[in-house]
Amino acid sequence: MSIEALKTQLPAFAKDVKLNLSALPREDSLTEQQLYGLLVACGYTTRNGTVAQALEAEAAPHLSPAALDAAKAAASIMAMNNVYYRFTHLASNKAYETLPAKLRMSVIGNPGVDKVDFELWSLAVSAMNGCGRCIDAHEAVLREAGLSEAQIQTAVRVGAIIASAAVALEAAGAGFPEAAE
């Protein structure tokens, strides 16, 4: 499956989603690895198998096996970090911020791809998961590395488009097998 195949599964009410998905491969402010890694990381972050499989199929010809694995690693490690750090940030009891996390996250230090690309994928996933602390941390690293605000915004926009595709599928019943009964 690909973006084109995914679009055919979207309902009529999701015309804007289809148009936004169509524009993704033409995005030119990011490198090929950055863009296609975003498709994979954000696709898996939706937790929608149809979306994840379609975007991985679209991205695979453009990514090395190491980059494909790193994009999946960004989705999985941020799933953990976003829950944990969103809790420590939002909890009224600030003592939680002083406790050691005791979470293994060595992939962040050695992702197997350019660290800037991994940070960009992590930022988009963090935006999708709503972790303000992680968003700020990744955005600061990316700005320090020289990425522009427009490039950072593009990454988050890609995540937003992908999230909207998953919701459109689910709203149409494609993501809930029990809805077909």
From Swiss-Prot:
Coiled-coil annotation reads none
Organism equals Azorhizobium caulinodans (strain ATCC 43989 / DSM 5975 / JCM 20966 / LMG 6465 / NBRC 14845 / NCIMB 13405 / ORS 571)
- Cite a single GO BP annotation: cell redox homeostasis
Enzyme Commission code(s) on record: 1.11.1.28
Single Gene Ontology MF annotation: alkyl hydroperoxide reductase activity
Spell out the protein name for this chain.
Alkyl hydroperoxide reductase AhpD
Membership in a protein family: Belongs to the AhpD family.
Report the catalytic activity: N(6)-[(R)-dihydrolipoyl]-L-lysyl-[lipoyl-carrier protein] + a hydroperoxide = N(6)-[(R)-lipoyl]-L-lysyl-[lipoyl-carrier protein] + an alcohol + H2O
**Can you tell me which residues form the catalytic site?**
131, 134
Keywords, A to Z, come to: Antioxidant, Disulfide bond, Oxidoreductase, Peroxidase, Redox-active center
- Which PANTHER family does its entry note? ALKYL HYDROPEROXIDE REDUCTASE AHPD (PTHR33930:SF7)
Role this protein plays: Antioxidant protein with alkyl hydroperoxidase activity. Required for the reduction of the AhpC active site cysteine residues and for the regeneration of the AhpC enzyme activity.
Q: List the disulfide bonds.
A: 131-134
Asked if the Swiss-Prot or TrEMBL record annotates the protein with the keyword Chaperone, the reply is no
User: Is Transferase among the key words of this record?
Assistant: no
